[in-house]
């Protein structure tokens, strides 16, 4: 829903700044001041910070964001194993976030490395992107997308108050109506995502 909130600010002509960082990078990696933001982007890399992508997917141009700067931590306190895990051999910090740069050098966060699902033909599928689309539906409050037996399954919390308000005259039939509502949601989502990111099942969560 972050992109929706950002679009709202743009439509309202409300000035805003944006930034991206982690505690370990103390804290900013990239950012943009009002007037220089770009929808969906965290902005360019900050002065004094170096960032690059590792293990880039040749199809999408996406890769893990790794950074180096004077403000990046030198390690976790008394935990050399964890420290070793988050640094590359040449000393860059692994954010475990996936992203890409556009031609202007603006950074776009695509998802978490640990959450990424690999499609049947090697596609990178980001549950967060699909969840954003699902959550933009007016009957949805929250969702989680996961992979089960090679299919993408959406676990969805519906807005029960809105459902009952909309279908008040047939409240007793709402249970039967849910199959149609879930099918409509699936069509809505699949019309807005890549072919390999289409969901196959919607499961209502209560």
Spans of features found by a protein language model:
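A structural signal for short hydrophobic beta-strand segments in well-ordered beta-sheet cores
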Residues: 51-53, 97-101, 145
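Conserved C-terminal "lid"/linker of ANL adenylate-forming enzymes
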Residues: 117, 142-150, 184-206
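Conserved ATP-binding/catalytic segment of the ANL
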Residues: 45, 59-119, 136
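Short acidic amphipathic segments
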Residues: 134-143
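Ser/Thr-glycine-rich phosphate-binding loops at phosphate-binding pockets of nucleotides
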Residues: 21-25, 95, 120
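Adenylate-forming
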Residues: 72, 106-135, 162-177, 195-200
């Amino acid at each position: 829903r972050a992109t929706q909130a950002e679009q709202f600010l743009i439509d309202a002509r409300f000035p805003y700044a944006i930034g991206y960082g982690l505690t370990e990078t103390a804290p900013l990696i990239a950012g943009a001041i009002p007037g220089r933001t770009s929808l969906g982007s965290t902005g360019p890399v900050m002065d004094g910070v170096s960032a690059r992508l590792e293990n880039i997917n040749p199809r999408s141009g996406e890769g893990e964001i790794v950074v180096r700067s004077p403000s990046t931590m030198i390690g976790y306190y008394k935990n050399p194993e964890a420290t070793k895990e988050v640094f590359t051999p040449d000393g860059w910090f692994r954010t475990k976030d996936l992203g890409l740069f556009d031609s202007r050098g603006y950074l776009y966060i695509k998802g978490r490395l640990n959450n990424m699902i690999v499609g049947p033909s090697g596609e990178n599928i980001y549950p967060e992107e699909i969840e954003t689309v699902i959550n933009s539906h007016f009957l949805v409050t929250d969702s989680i997308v996961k992979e089960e037996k090679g299919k993408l399954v959406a676990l969805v919390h519906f807005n029960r108050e809105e459902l009952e308000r909309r279908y008040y005259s047939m409240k007793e039939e709402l249970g039967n109506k849910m199959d149609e509502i879930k099918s409509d949601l699936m069509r809505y989502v699949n019309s807005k995502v890549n072919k390999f990111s289409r969901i196959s099942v919607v499961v209502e969560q209560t």
